[in-house]
Amino acid sequence: MMKGQLAGLMKQAQQMQENMKKMQEQLAQIEVEGQSGAGLVKVTMTCKNDVRRVSIDPSLLADDKDMLEDLVAAAFNDAVRKAEATAQEKMGGMTSGLPLPPGFKLPF
């Protein structure tokens, strides 16, 4: 490999690293909301999986504890899926053009 090509690759890698750092900071600010029980339980979290809020409709507090626990878990899982999808969408542009194998996931 020529010296100029190597320098170009190093510069490209450094720029990508800077862009990824900026995107990570942005993802920490983006909030998604997961729901279950037709919106009776809501979990709001960032795309970095930091939970910001859990909202439980008061009508559920007198109900079955097991059902409430299941609804909270389902809302949390819904929020995680939405956070992952949003992160993949936002980060997808950064990896386009890279020769990565299909299905390869970088640690976002």
From Swiss-Prot:
InterPro entries cross-referenced by the UniProt entry: YbaB-like_sf, YbaB/EbfC
Pro residues: bias regions: 99-108
Location in or out of the cell: Cytoplasm, Nucleoid
Single GO cellular component term: bacterial nucleoid
Region (Disordered): 87-108
Description of how the protein assembles with itself and partners: Homodimer.
PANTHER family for the chain: NUCLEOID-ASSOCIATED PROTEIN YBAB
UniProt similarity note: Belongs to the YbaB/EbfC family.
HAMAP family the record matches: DNA_YbaB_EbfC (MF_00274)
UniProt protein name: Nucleoid-associated protein Bphy_0952
